[in-house]
């Protein structure tokens, strides 16, 4: 059984017991969260696709940890103008574990 969920502006295919990194969610570590934006649920041959969401479907997950991703280096430059700009960015994320998928 798997589901397609939407969180943080992105879509993820998830199954029970899976761990994944999503955009930062304001929740404490080891707390339960309920993801209600379920786009699709598949259980064997039975597939339910929402338009756009599956009504009444939820995915329960546990927050495993919070962290920051790898640093991305940004370099801007204007030719012949002696302009250079260096920047860096590290995106915050939340690692979650999928506990249950309900229809």
Swiss-Prot record:
Keywords: Ribonucleoprotein, Ribosomal protein, RNA-binding, rRNA-binding. GO terms for molecular function: rRNA binding; structural constituent of ribosome. SUPFAM superfamilies: L21p-like. It comes from the Bacteria. GO terms for biological process: translation. Pfam families: Ribosomal_L21p (PF00829). GO terms for cellular component: cytoplasm; ribonucleoprotein complex; ribosome. NCBIfam families: L21. Part of the 50S ribosomal subunit. Contacts protein L20. This protein binds to 23S rRNA in the presence of protein L20. HAMAP family: Ribosomal_bL21 (MF_01363). Belongs to the bacterial ribosomal protein bL21 family. This is Large ribosomal subunit protein bL21. It comes from Chromobacterium violaceum (strain ATCC 12472 / DSM 30191 / JCM 1249 / CCUG 213 / NBRC 12614 / NCIMB 9131 / NCTC 9757 / MK).
